[in-house]
Curated annotation (Swiss-Prot):
It comes from Mus musculus. Residues 17-32 have a biased composition (Basic and acidic residues). Keywords: Acetylation, Isomerase, mRNA processing, mRNA splicing, Nucleus, Repeat, Rotamase, Spliceosome, WD repeat. The gene is Ppwd1. This is Peptidylprolyl isomerase domain and WD repeat-containing protein 1. The keyword Cell cycle does not apply. One of its GO terms (cellular component) is nuclear body. Identified in the spliceosome C complex. Inhibited by cyclosporin A (CsA). It is found in: Nucleus. It comes from the Eukaryota. The modification N-acetylalanine is found at residue 2. InterPro entries: Cyclophilin-like_dom_sf, Cyclophilin-type_PPIase_dom, Cyclophilin_A-like, WD40/YVTN_repeat-like_dom_sf, WD40_repeat_dom_sf, WD40_rpt.
Length: 646
C-alpha cells in the first residue's frame, strides 16, 4: 500500500509539473508503473525508499494585487506636494466644480459665483455673479458641462449657460432648498433638474429652462432631509440619500420617475445599501466612476465606502475617523506633535459647526482612483489595490474641504492629433501637454487652491507670489493701511536686553512688514519690558512676549490677532531664528521665540521675521537653564529688561 500511495503521489506531482499536452501525461504515467513493478521484486528496498509520509508541496504565496499601467494613470494626476496658485473670493469659499467644457466654477458663503476658464497652464478669470442674496446651499453642473445651477437660502434657483457664462433662468422655489442636481442626459427633451426641501424629504423636479411649476414631486421616497442627489449618466439613474442613512435609486422624466430597470437587484435587502443605516450614519458626498459601475461615498462617520452600482454591494471601506488618525500617529509619527494637535483641534471644530458635510470625494478619469481631503492632506487611493498611493498638501497649512479634478488638455486644437503627430519629434507638438489640476476649497478660507504637477518654485518667475490678490481690499483693510505710519514705525534691527545679556537682532520689514511693525511698536512702547521667558525647551527654543507669563496672553498693537506673513526666503533652516508664536493659522499676537537649532517643520506655520546677529551665547545660556519638566517654565525667572529699536 505504501508503494501504491507513493506512486500515486509521484504521479500527481508529475501531472502538476507537466500541464502541457496529453503526450507528456502518458509518458509520466508509464514511469511510475515501472517503479511499481521493480518494487515487487525487492520489497526491502521499496520499504527503505517509501518510509514515512511524503513531503507536501509548498503552497504558492498569494500574489499582491497590481493595477496594470498604474504609473501611467498616476502621471495624469497632480503630483506636487504644495499648491501652485490660489485665488480669492470676498468671503469663505464653500463649493467648487469642474465642467467637461473646461470651466471651473466657485461659490462663496456670501452668495457670489465666479466662472474661471482652464487654459494650457493655469486658469483665467471669466465672470462674476451675485447669484444669491444669502448663503449658497448647493451647486450642480450637468453631465455634459453645458448647464450650471445654484440654490440658496433666498428660496431661489439660478440657472447658467456655462459655455456662454450667462444667467439664463431664475426659479422661485417657495421653500428653503437643500440639494440640487441636473438629472437629464444628453439627448433628453427636457433639461430636468432636481431640488430638495431642506427640512423635509421632498424632491421637486423642474424644467431647468422652464417656469416655477414642478414637473413631479417625490413626497414619499424619503422621510428625512436629503444629504445628496447624484445622477449616474451612464445608466441614466439617480441616487439620493437622506439623514436617516437611506439610499434610493430612481429615474427622471424619460423613464417616468420609476425604479431603474438596468440594475441587478430588486429588493434592497439583497444589497449593502443599508450599511449607513446600520452604522447610524449617512452619506455626505456621493460620486460615480466614469464607467458608472462604482459609487464612492463619504459618511458622516468619516468612513469612505465604495459600492458597486449595479448590485449595490459594498466593495471597499476606508476608515478616516479621528481615532484612526490618533492611533496612526502613535504607531508611526505622521506629523510633529504640536502640528498634529493643532490639526485635531481643527477637525473637532469641523464637527462642531457641521462643516464635514462640505467635504466631497471624486473619481479620476480612469475610475481606478478616488481623491478626497483629510487632516493630512488630499489622499489619492487606488481602489483596485486598496492602497494610498499619494498624499498632496501634507505640509500645507490648510484643511482641504471640497475638491474638483481637471484632467486632459484644456486648449482645443482645430484637428485631432494623429499617430504620426504623436510619434514625431516636433517640439511645437511636444509642448502641448496635459495639465492635471486639483482645485480645492479650505476650511474658513476665502481662497481656493490649485495643486498641479508643478511645485511653487517651478513657476516662471522666482519672485512671483503664489497667493494672488485678485480682490480689492475691504474698507477695514484700507483704513488699517492708511492709519499706519509707514516706515517710521518699523526698523531693520533691534537689541533685546535680558537679565542674562544682550541679543542683537536683524529684522525683515520688507518681507513681513506687519509682523516687524507689531514687534517694533510694542518694543518702543515698553510692552515687552519685564516679560519673562515663560517657556524654554533645551535644544529647541526660548519663548517670551506674554505679559501674563502663562503662554496664554498677549495681543497685537491693533488689538487681538493678525495674519501670518510667510516668505519663501525666510525659513527655519538655521539656529537663532526669530519667529512668531501662535495658536494656529493667523493667530499672531505678541509672543515670539528664538530657536537654537534648525526647525524646518515650523516652515509655513510660524512667521520668521528676524535673525540673531550677535549674542548667540546669551540665547544658548538661556536655553540651558533648569526648567519644570511638566511646564517648561524656568525655576528662576529670566526676563527682558527692555528692547532698543534702532
Amino acid at each position: 500500500m505504501a508503494t501504491e500511495s507513493g506512486s500515486d503521489s509521484q504521479l500527481r506531482r508529475r501531472r502538476r509539473r507537466d500541464p502541457e499536452g496529453s503526450e507528456k501525461t502518458e509518458l509520466s504515467e508509464r514511469e511510475p508503473a515501472l517503479a511499481v513493478a521493480g518494487s515487487e521484486e525487492n520489497d526491502d528496498e521499496n520499504e527503505e525508499r517509501w518510509v514515512g509520509p511524503l513531503p507536501v508541496e509548498a503552497t504558492l504565496a498569494k500574489k499582491r494585487k497590481v493595477l496594470e499601467f498604474e504609473r501611467v494613470y498616476l502621471d495624469n494626476l497632480p503630483s506636487a506636494s504644495m499648491y501652485e496658485r490660489s485665488y480669492m473670493h470676498r468671503d469663505v469659499i464653500t463649493h467648487v466644480v469642474c465642467t467637461k467644457t473646461d470651466f471651473i466654477i466657485t461659490a462663496s458663503h456670501d452668495g457670489h459665483v465666479k466662472f474661471w476658464k482652464k487654459i494650457e497652464e493655469g486658469i483665467e478669470f471669466v465672470k462674476h455673479f451675485r447669484s444669491h442674496l444669502g448663503v449658497i446651499e448647493s451647486i450642480a453642473v450637468s453631465s455634459e458641462g453645458a448647464l450650471f445651477c445654484s440654490v440658496g437660502d433666498d428660496k431661489a434657483m439660478k440657472v447658467f449657460d456655462v459655455v456662454n457664462f450667462d444667467m439664463i433662468n431664475m426659479l422661485k422655489l417657495g421653500y428653503f432648498p437643500g440639494q440640487c442636481e441636473w438629472i437629464y442626459c444628453p439627448g433628453d427633451a427636457i433639461s430636468s433638474v432636481a431640488a430638495s426641501e431642506k427640512s423635509t424629504g421632498k424632491i421637486f423636479i423642474y424644467d431647468g429652462r422652464g417656469d416655477n411649476q414642478p414637473l413631479h414631486i417625490f413626497d414619499k421616497l424619503h422621510v428625512s432631509p436629503l444629504t445628496q442627489i447624484r445622477l449616474n449618466p451612464v445608466y441614466k439613474a439617480v441616487v439620493s440619500s437622506d439623514k436617516s442613512g437611506m439610499i434610493e435609486y430612481w429615474t427622471g422624466p424619460p423613464h417616468e420617475y420609476k425604479f431603474p430597470k438596468n440594475v441587478n437587484w430588486e429588493y434592497k435587502t439583497d444589497t449593502d445599501l443599508y450599511e449607513f443605516a446600520k452604522c447610524k450614519a449617512y452619506p455626505t458626498s456621493i460620486c460615480f466612476s466614469p464607467d458608472g459601475k462604482k459609487i464612492a461615498t463619504i459618511g458622516s462617520d468619516r468612513k469612505v465606502r465604495i459600492f458597486r452600482f449595479l448590485t449595490g454591494k459594498l466593495m471597499r471601506v476606508f476608515d478616516e475617523s479621528l481615532s484612526m488618525f490618533t492611533e496612526l500617529q502613535q504607531m508611526r509619527q505622521q506629523l510633529p506633535d504640536m502640528e498634529f494637535g493643532r490639526r485635531m483641534a481643527v477637525e473637532r471644530e469641523l464637527e462642531k459647526v457641521d462643516a464635514v458635510r462640505l467635504v466631497n470625494i471624486v473619481f479620476d478619469e480612469t475610475g481606478h482612483f478616488v481623491l478626497y481631503g483629510t487632516m493630512l492632506g488630499i489622499k489619492v487611493i487606488n481602489v483596485e489595490t486598496n492602497r494610498c498611493v499619494r498624499i498632496l498638501g501634507k505640509q500645507e497649512n490648510i484643511r482641504v474641504m471640497q475638491l474638483a479634478l481637471f484632467q486632459g488638455i484644456a486648449k482645443k486644437h482645430r484637428a485631432a492629433a494623429t499617430i504620426e503627430m504623436k510619434a514625431s519629434e516636433n517640439p511645437v507638438l511636444q509642448n502641448i501637454q496635459a495639465d492635471p489640476t486639483i482645485v480645492c476649497t479650505s476650511f474658513k478660507k476665502n481662497r481656493f487652491y490649485m495643486f498641479t504637477k508643478r511645485e511653487p518654485e517651478d513657476t516662471k518667475t522666482a519672485d512671483s507670489d503664489r497667493d494672488v490678490f485678485n480682490e480689492k481690499p475691504s474698507k477695514e483693510e484700507v483704513m488699517a493701511a492708511t492709519q499706519a505710519e509707514g516706515p517710521k514705525r518699523v526698523s531693520d534691527s533691534a537689541i533685546v536686553h535680558t537679565s542674562m545679556g544682550d541679543i542683537h537682532i536683524k529684522l525683515f520689514p520688507v518681507e513681513c512688514p506687519k509682523t516687524v511693525e507689531n514687534f517694533c511698536v510694542h518694543s518702543r512702547n515698553g510692552y515687552y519690558n519685564g516679560h519673562t521667558f515663560h517657556r524654554i525647551i533645551k535644544g529647541f527654543m526660548i519663548q517670551t512676549g506674554d505679559p501674563t507669563g502663562t503662554g496664554m496672553g498677549g495681543e497685537s498693537i491693533w488689538g487681538g490677532e493678525f495674519e501670518d506673513e510667510f516668505h519663501s526666503t525666510l525659513r527655519h533652516d538655521r539656529p537663532y531664528t526669530l519667529s512668531m508664536a501662535n495658536a494656529g493659522s493667523n493667530t499672531n499676537g505678541s509672543q515670539f521665540f528664538i530657536t537654537v537649532v534648525p526647525t524646518p517643520w515650523l516652515d509655513n506655520k510660524h512667521t520668521v521675521f528676524g535673525r540673531v546677529t550677535k549674542g548667540m551665547e546669551v540665547v544658548q545660556r538661556i536655553s540651558n537653564v533648569k526648567v519644570n519638566p511638566k511646564t517648561d517654565k524656568p525655576y528662576e525667572d529670566v526676563s527682558i529688561i527692555n528692547i532698543t529699536v534702532k
